[in-house]
């Protein structure tokens, strides 16, 4: 279900979700599914058509299955102004990256 938000609210939500993802609190698939459903209010079929991939590939990404190429991941996140990149595996390093101080 699409939630009506201002541009500022959407940006704030996106930043919070990205922080959760970097800290390992939500998966890449969970992030994408939340954005697709709650920000855009789109079905998998319509979103897959929008970004130019198959619905099956989108399902696999949202369920954290398979091993998609970086280009595919970049395609599915592009409508949100996000691309894939390297991120620390260890939570304390991710926290340092986000906050700028060691814990």
Task: For each feature predicted by the language model, list its residue ranges.
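Flexible coil/turn residues that form the inter-helical turn or adjacent wing/linker of helix-turn-helix
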Residues: 28-29, 39-40
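Short alpha-helical DNA-recognition segment
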Residues: 41-59
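DNA major-groove recognition helix of helix-turn-helix/homeodomain DNA-binding modules
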Residues: 69-89
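Residues within the helices of the helix-turn-helix
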Residues: 33-34, 45
């Amino acid at each position: 279900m699409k939630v009506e938000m201002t541009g500022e609210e959407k940006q704030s939500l996106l930043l919070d979700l990205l922080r959760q993802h970097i800290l390992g609190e939500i998966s890449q698939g969970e992030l994408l599914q939340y954005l697709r459903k709650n920000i855009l209010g789109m079905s998998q079929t319509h979103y897959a058509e929008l970004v130019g991939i198959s619905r099956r590939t989108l399902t696999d990404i949202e369920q954290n299955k398979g091993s998609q190429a970086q280009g595919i991941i970049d395609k599915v996140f592009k409508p949100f102004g996000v691309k894939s990149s390297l991120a620390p595996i260890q939570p304390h390093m991710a926290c340092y990256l986000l906050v700028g101080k060691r814990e």
